[in-house]
Design a protein with these regions (language model features):
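Short, well-ordered secondary-structure micro-motifs within conserved domains or adaptor modules
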Residues: 49-54
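Flexible, small-/acidic-enriched active-site or ligand-binding loops
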Residues: 156-160, 166
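Short, acidic (Asp/Glu-rich) active-site segment that either coordinates a divalent metal cofactor
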Residues: 168-190
């Protein structure tokens, strides 16, 4: 384990217990932690302090998929492309249409992970009608800064068990906990898609069209 004045080192846990052990040791040394998937959005925001980088890239794989129930669970490091391909094979999709910002932020193309999508609340233009990524998240498994493994939410929307911690983690960029698995809603693919382009509209009319 490096001390706090040295450059970042990369850790890639392949199991929850490995992640817990890593965070436990990091906490002893009081080092800052940067959480990434494949690092496609590392170019966004302020550069982190040198410390330890934890990548969830080795925590991958779909753990549950029930097309008839419109629900899927996947480990955080599962590539978004793999998730979307499996959904498409069953005529389904992610309704919030996460886009690929890798090239725009200096990262690689096609490198997003499903955990990274929810950790950053990455949502496309369909969020206006379908809601953002956080609105589709049903539950999550995560490890906090005390190396404690916890689960929040479940596989159904009506899951009244107190605070919705899973949705609180969405958009937190890994600053609250490291998500290791996410469960989310999926939707049927539309039979057809039409794109409309309007130009030269006044602001009030443009807003009206969006809503």
């Amino acid at each position: 384990m490096k001390d706090k004045d040295q450059v970042s080192e990369l850790l890639r846990p392949a199991a929850n217990w490995e992640l817990q052990s890593m965070i436990d040791k990091i906490a002893v040394h009081k080092l800052p932690i940067e959480v990434i998937g494949h690092g496609s959005l590392r170019g966004m925001g302020r550069p982190p302090q040198p410390g330890v980088v934890i990548s969830t890239a080795s925590l991958r794989g779909v753990t549950l998929y029930e097309p008839s129930e419109l629900v899927m669970s996947a480990r955080a490091g599962t590539p978004l492309l793999e998730v979307e391909a499996e959904l498409a094979a069953n005529g389904q999709m992610l309704s919030f249409e996460p886009m690929d910002l890798g090239p725009a932020t200096g990262g690689p193309a096609g490198a997003q992970t499903i955990g990274g999508v929810f950790a950053t609340n990455l949502s496309g233009s369909r969020r206006i009608a379908a809601g953002a990524a956080r609105d589709q998240l049903l539950g999550a498994v995560a490890v906090n800064g005390r190396a404690e493994l916890f689960k929040s939410g479940g596989r159904v929307m009506k899951n009244v068990t107190g605070y919705d911690v899973a949705r609180g983690l969405t958009g937190s960029w890994g600053t609250l906990a490291v998500m290791t698995e996410v469960t989310f809603k999926v939707m049927p693919l539309p039979e057809s898609v039409v794109t409309l382009l309007y130009t030269g509209l006044p602001d009030d009319l443009a807003v009206e069209l969006l809503t």
